[in-house]
A protein has these predicted regions:
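N-terminal beta-strand-loop-alpha-helix module at the start
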Residues: 1-71
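Short His-Asn-centered micro-motif
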Residues: 6-10, 29-30, 69-71, 97-100, ...
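Hydrophobic/aromatic-rich, well-ordered segments within soluble, folded domains that form packed cores
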Residues: 47-67, 96-97, 357-380
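Active-site-proximal binding-pocket segments
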Residues: 262, 267, 272-440
Length: 493
C-alpha cells in the first residue's frame, strides 16, 4: 500500500521524532486559503512560511523525500486540490498525519479522505504531553472542570516538583507570589535577535502582494527552526527565568515581553515540544538555583494551562463557538485595530499586537478581552480579533481562551467567574498614570455589573460587587456611566 505522510504548518516537530521510513514521501503546502480565511497577522504568515521552508530544508538534508508547494507553485489552488493531485499522481492509498488540533480543518481533512477512499492514520501529537483519551478520562461526567485539579494530576503523573507525592514548597501553586509590579527603574532584558530565514525577502513580497489588507507589521523576530528555539530558550533561562515569577502578571506601558519566555508560537508550530521545554527548565533550575515560584509558574503555564486549554477545546470547542452567555451583540470598529480608542492601556496593548503579533497574557486577559467584554462586544468578534492579531493564534488556543477565560461567553465550563476589572487593577499592576481613561474603564466595569446584577447577586463570591455598586457616590456613578456610554457609542457598532 502506497503511503503519504502529510505534515501541516503547525506540525514541524524535531526531525529526531519524525519516525518515518525515508522511502515514504512527505507532503507540505503553503496555502493562500489557510492564510486568508481569517486575516492573519502579516508576521504570523511570515513565521509560518519561514518555519515551513526551514523544516523542508532540514527534511531534505536528512534524505527525506519532500513534495513541497510554495507560494510560487499554484498558490491560489486550494490545499486539498494540491493534495488530491499528489494522491492521484502517486496512487496513494493511505495518509499518515499527526493529530489535527483545529476542528474545522480536521473535519475538512476527514471529508477529503472519505470522499477519495483514502485510509487515514492519525499519529499521537508531540505538541502535547497528555493524550486526548487521558484528558477525557479526567473530565469524567462532571459539568464543571477546574484547571487546578488537572494541574495537580499532571504534576503527579509526571512526578514534577514532588517530594513523597506532595508538592515541594508546601503548595501546588505559587501564583499569589507572582503578582508583583515592576519596581521603578527595573531593567527589562532584551529579547535575542533572530536571523531571518534566507528566503524572508521573497516571503515578504508574497505577503505584501497577497495579504496587504491583513493587520500587523511585517517582521521576522521569532525563531523559525529547532536550532533557533533551543538557543532562544537558553537565553530566556539565563536572562529572564530567575525573575519570571515575580513579575509574571506585571504590565509595562513600553514593553510587551518583560520576563516572559515568548515560547507560545514556537510550541504551537511544533518547533520544540513541551516535554523538552519542561525537561530543560527543570535541569536548568536545579543547576542554577532558580526560585521555586518562577519554576513552578513557568511549568504551570505549560503542563497546566496549555494542556488544559487543548483538552477543553477538544471536548467543548463546538459548544463554545455557539455560546453567547451575556447575549452581547456590539461590533468592533477600526479603533480596535489601530489603537485609537482613547484608553491608553488598551491602545498600547493594541499597538503591541499590531507591531509584534504578541503581548503577554495579562494584557490579553485583563486589558484586551476585559474591555471588549465590558463593551458588550459579540464574542465571535472578539475571537476573530484575537485570531487575526496574534502570531501564536490557533482555533484550539483562542476558542477556550476567548469564549471561556476571556469573556465567560460559555457560561462557565472551566472559568469560575468572569475576569473583569476596573482601572484600579490596571494601575496597581502597571506604570500607567491616572487619567481620563480611568473614568471610562470604571464606568464600563460598574455598568457591566449593574446590567448583569441578577448574575452577580446570586453568586456568593461575586455578590460583594453588588454591595460595592450600591455604595457608589451617585454623582460619581452618573459621571462614569456617561463616560462609558460615550465610549461604547464611539468605538462599537
Amino acid at each position: 500500500m502506497k503511503i503519504l505522510r502529510v505534515i501541516l504548518g503547525n506540525q514541524l516537530f524535531p526531525i529526531s521524532q519524525i519516525n518515518l521510513s525515508k522511502d515514504v514521501p512527505i507532503f507540505m503546502a503553503e496555502d493562500s486559503g489557510l492564510c486568508s480565511y481569517i486575516k492573519h497577522h502579516k508576521s504570523k504568515i511570515a513565521l509560518f512560511f519561514s518555519a515551513m521552508r526551514s523544516y523542508r530544508d532540514q527534511l531534505k538534508n536528512n534524505s527525506y523525500k519532500v513534495i513541497y508547494y510554495d507560494a510560487n507553485n499554484n498558490f491560489s489552488t486550494s490545499y486539498f486540490e494540491k493534495l488530491f493531485h499528489e494522491v492521484k499522481s502517486n496512487k496513494i492509498k493511505k495518509i499518515e498525519i499527526y493529530e489535527i488540533e483545529d476542528k474545522p480543518f480536521e473535519k475538512d481533512f476527514l471529508e477529503f479522505c472519505k470522499t477519495n477512499n483514502i485510509e487515514i492514520n492519525f499519529l499521537p501529537s508531540p505538541m502535547f504531553i497528555d493524550s486526548r483519551g487521558a484528558f477525557k478520562y479526567f473530565l469524567g461526567d462532571k459539568k464543571f472542570h477546574l484547571q487546578a485539579n488537572y494541574y495537580k494530576q499532571m504534576r503527579k503523573k509526571m512526578n514534577l516538583l514532588l517530594e513523597d507525592n506532595k508538592p515541594i514548597g508546601g503548595k501546588w501553586s505559587f501564583d499569589e507570589d507572582n503578582r508583583k509590579k515592576l519596581p521603578s527603574g527595573y531593567k527589562i532584558p532584551k529579547l535575542p535577535t533572530i536571523k531571518p530565514y534566507k528566503e524572508f525577502s521573497e516571503i515578504s513580497n508574497v505577503i505584501n502582494i497577497n495579504f496587504s489588507n491583513h493587520p500587523g507589521e511585517l517582521h521576522s523576530w521569532m525563531p523559525h527552526s529547532y536550532e533557533q528555539i533551543v538557543e532562544w530558550l537558553e537565553i530566556f533561562f539565563k536572562d529572564r527565568f530567575r525573575e519570571f515569577g515575580h513579575y509574571e502578571d506585571a504590565i509595562d506601558k513600553n514593553e510587551h515581553f518583560i520576563n516572559h519566555s515568548v515560547l507560545s508560537s514556537s510550541l504551537n508550530l511544533g518547533l520544540i515540544t513541551p516535554k523538552e521545554v519542561i525537561d530543560k527548565s527543570i535541569a536548568y533550575a536545579k543547576k542554577n538555583d532558580i526560585p521555586l515560584n518562577s519554576l513552578e509558574g513557568f511549568i504551570r503555564q505549560i503542563i497546566g494551562w496549555r494542556e488544559f486549554i487543548r483538552g477543553i477545546y477538544q471536548n467543548y470547542g463546538d459548544q463554545m463557538v455557539t455560546s453567547n452567555y451575556w447575549n452581547h451583540k456590539n461590533k468592533l470598529t477600526a479603533a480596535w485595530y489601530d489603537g485609537s480608542t482613547g484608553i491608553e492601556p488598551l491602545d498600547e496593548a493594541i499597538k503591541g499586537a499590531q507591531k509584534y503579533g504578541y503581548t503577554h497574557h495579562i494584557n490579553r486577559l485583563m486589558i484586551l478581552s476585559n474591555i471588549m467584554n465590558l463593551c458588550n462586544i459579540d464574542p465571535n468578534e472578539i475571537y476573530k480579533w484575537f485570531m487575526e492579531m496574534f502570531i501564536d493564534s490557533s482555533d484550539w488556543v483562542m476558542v477556550p481562551n476567548v469564549y471561556g477565560m476571556g469573556t465567560f461567553a460559555d457560561g462557565g465550563i472551566f472559568a469560575t467567574k468572569p475576569y473583569i476589572c476596573g482601572s484600579s487593577y490596571i494601575l496597581r499592576m502597571s506604570n500607567f498614570k491616572k487619567g481620563d481613561w480611568c473614568d471610562i474603564v470604571d464606568g464600563l466595569y460598574w455598568k457591566f455589573i449593574e446590567e448583569k446584577k441578577d448574575f452577580f447577586i446570586t453568586n456568593p463570591r461575586l455578590s460583594l460587587m453588588i454591595r460595592a455598586l450600591e455604595k457608589l457616590n451617585p454623582d460619581r456613578k452618573k459621571h462614569i456611566f456617561e463616560c462609558a456610554n460615550n465610549f461604547i457609542n464611539k468605538v462599537t457598532q
